[in-house]
Amino acid sequence: AGNIIVKEGELITIDGGSGKVMKGLVPTVQPEISGYFSTIMSWADKFRKLKVRTNAETENDSKTARKFGAEGIGLCRTEHMFFDENRILSVRQMILSKSRQDRDNALSKLLPFQKNDFKQIFKVMSGLPVTVRLLDPPLHEFLPKNSKDIEEVARSLNLGIKEVENRIFELHEENPMLGHRGCRLGISFPEIYEMQCEAIFKALVELKKD
């Protein structure tokens, strides 16, 4: 301990229970509900009144939650869907757009992704309740933080680096927990919520047809 050097790019494994850090990729197994705990939980299910729902925003998380007995999704945070590498550029394009038309063009690229996200989740939940939270955090959280990413965004959107930096500065908030977020964001940019609602309803319609 104390004399091991880990270089950038090397894999490590962290035991979340003990805090132990191990060099390299340690084989893992998926936890199972078994033994006495499984028996006690089955007894509890016969008498409990409380229903337990999960936080999930991906198909895999939804499957895991169902496996462990979740009876729906209590919070599906849609902002997590926007950080995926194959859609973050469209999100940034939407944020940096100067006109409603440009924003709509960027949102039209995001619509199929959102629809597919919701469709997968609704399919796994198979009729169980799903509470979807529309885009909540301040927009600056989706913008690049370092010069390399700023240059990449500026180049891909045909904007000047200074222009992108100025927009990031304009959107930055000292206390984002109380700032331009949630319903305030929806009032300022209703087209974002319109796209998300359209994605939800289209996902439901397609599932019904399937």
State where each predicted segment sits.
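Flexible, glycine-rich loop/tail regions that form catalytic "lids" or insertion modules at the edges
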Residues: 51, 61-210
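Acidic, glycine-rich flexible loop/linker segments
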Residues: 1-76, 80-94
